[in-house]
C-alpha cells in the first residue's frame, strides 16, 4: 500500500538567473511524497523547463495519473513495472516522471536502510566537483559574481555566454578568478561560424569546454563546430533522451544529461552507459531545483566526468536538505554519518 501526495513550491532565486534565452527570478518546483504506511516516505521533485514544453501547471496536470500508477502497483521496488506503466499512461512530461521516479527510488533506498549510491554500489570518492554557474549580467556584475564564487571556494565556474560582449565577459571572469577551471555555456546562441570565432578566443582564456554552441535545431551546425573547435564541445539541448546519445556521438565530446530532460534516474543511468559506449564523456546537469530533486542526481555523481549540480546553491534558501554540495565537492559519504538514505528530507522535519 502506497500513499502519494504532491505540492507546488515557489523557490526564490538569490540573484535573478539569466541565460541567452531569458531571465528567471523564481523556480517553480513540484514536490512528490510517497509513503509506505510504515513510517517511510520517499521524496522527489520536478523542476519543469518551458524549453522542453513543461511548466508547474503541466506537471500538476499529469501527476495524479502517474501517482495512481504508483498506488496501483503498490511496491517501491517494482520500478521497472511502474516505469513501463507510467509511460503507457503519460508518454512525455519528463520532469513529472522524474519527480515520481526520484521519490520511489528514495523510498526504496530508505526501506533498505542505505543511501541510493550505496544501493548501487558506487564509490563516493569518485565524485567530481560541481561547477558553480555565473548567469548573464553586466560584465562588472559577472566579474563580481565570479570573484565571490571563487572566494566561496568554488574551483569550477560555468559561465553563461551568448551576448554581443562574450569576449569581454570571459576576460573579466578570468581576471576575477585566475585559478578557476572555466567552462562556458552559450545555450545555442551562436551561429556555427560565430561559434568557431568565439571558441578560438575562449581557448586563449584557458576554458575547459564549450556547452551547446549552436541551437539543437541545427545538428549539422553542431557537427561543423565539433570538427573545427579547438575546445571540447558538450551537447545539452541537443542531448535530451536516450536516442539522442548515439545521434550526438559524432557531433560532441561530452553528453550533458539531466534528470528533468530524460525522466528520472532510470533513464539517466541508461543514458550514462550509452554515452560511455559511444565514447562520449559524461556530465550531469540540472535545472534550478530544490535538493528534493538534485540530491538524486548527486547519487549518480561517481559515474561522471563532470558535474554541474549547483541548482540548489542558486536558490535564496532551499527548504529541503539533500546531499551536501560545496566548492570542495559533492559529499556523498556525509550521508552515512547523518543516516540519511535516498534523497532530501525537509530541513524543519
Ligand atoms: Mg546547458
Indicate where each model-derived feature is located.
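Conserved, mostly hydrophobic/aromatic
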Residues: 32, 39, 100, 113, ...
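Catalytic alpha/beta core domains of metabolic enzymes, predominantly
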Residues: 217-308
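Predominant activation on well-ordered alpha-helical scaffold segments within soluble catalytic domains
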Residues: 60, 64-67, 101, 105-106, ...
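Metal- or metallocofactor-binding catalytic centers and their adjacent structured scaffolds
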Residues: 6-8, 22, 35-37, 41-111, ...
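Hydrophobic faces of well-ordered beta-strands that scaffold small-molecule active sites
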Residues: 42-44, 128-134, 155-159, 182-186, ...
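Flexible C-terminal active-site loop/helix
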Residues: 4, 8-12, 27-29, 37, ...
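Haloarchaeal acidic low-complexity proteome signature biased toward cell-envelope/secretome components but also
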Residues: 1-19, 23-26, 65-66, 72-73, ...
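Metal-dependent enolase-superfamily TIM-barrel catalytic cores that perform enediolate-based chemistry
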Residues: 118-229
Amino acid at each position: 500500500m502506497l500513499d502519494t501526495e504532491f505540492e507546488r513550491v515557489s523557490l526564490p532565486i538569490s540573484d535573478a538567473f539569466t541565460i541567452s534565452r531569458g531571465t528567471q527570478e523564481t523556480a517553480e518546483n513540484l514536490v512528490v511524497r510517497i509513503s509506505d504506511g510504515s513510517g517511510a516516505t520517499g521524496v522527489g521533485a520536478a523542476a519543469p523547463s518551458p524549453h522542453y514544453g513543461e511548466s508547474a501547471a503541466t506537471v500538476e496536470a499529469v501527476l495524479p495519473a502517474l501517482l495512481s500508477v504508483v498506488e496501483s502497483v503498490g511496491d517501491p521496488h517494482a520500478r521497472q513495472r511502474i516505469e513501463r506503466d507510467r509511460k503507457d499512461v503519460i508518454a512525455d512530461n519528463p520532469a513529472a516522471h522524474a519527480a515520481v521516479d526520484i521519490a520511489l527510488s528514495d523510498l526504496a533506498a530508505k526501506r533498505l536502510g542505505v543511501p541510493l549510491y550505496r544501493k548501487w554500489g558506487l564509490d563516493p570518492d569518485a565524485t567530481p566537483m560541481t561547477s558553480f554557474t555565473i548567469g548573464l549580467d553586466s560584465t562588472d556584475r559577472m566579474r563580481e559574481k565570479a570573484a565571490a564564487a571563487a572566494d566561496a571556494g568554488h574551483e569550477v565556474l560555468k559561465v553563461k555566454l551568448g551576448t554581443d560582449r562574450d569576449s569581454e565577459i570571459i576576460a573579466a571572469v578570468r581576471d576575477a578568478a585566475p585559478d578557476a577551471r572555466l567552462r562556458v555555456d552559450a545555450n545555442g546562441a551562436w551561429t556555427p561560424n560565430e561559434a568557431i570565432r568565439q571558441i578560438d578566443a575562449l581557448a586563449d582564456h584557458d576554458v575547459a569546454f564549450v556547452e551547446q554552441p549552436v541551437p539543437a535545431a541545427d545538428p549539422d551546425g553542431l557537427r561543423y563546430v565539433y570538427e573545427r573547435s579547438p575546445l571540447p564541445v558538450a551537447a545539452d539541448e541537443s542531448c535530451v533522451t536516450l536516442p539522442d546519445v548515439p545521434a550526438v556521438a559524432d557531433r560532441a565530446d561530452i553528453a550533458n544529461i539531466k534528470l528533468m530532460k530524460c525522466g528520472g534516474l532510470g533513464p539517466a543511468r541508461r543514458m550514462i552507459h550509452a554515452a560511455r559506449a559511444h565514447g562520449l564523456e559524461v556530465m550531469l546537469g540540472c535545472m534550478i531545483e530544490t535538493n528534493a530533486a538534485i540530491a538524486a542526481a548527486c547519487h549518480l555523481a561517481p559515474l561522471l566526468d563532470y558535474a554541474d549540480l549547483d541548482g540548489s546553491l542558486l536558490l535564496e534558501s532551499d527548504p529541503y536538505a539533500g546531499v551536501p554540495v560545496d566548492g570542495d565537492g559533492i559529499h556523498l559519504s556525509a550521508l552515512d554519518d547523518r543516516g540519511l538514505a535516498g534523497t532530501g528530507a525537509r530541513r524543519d522535519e
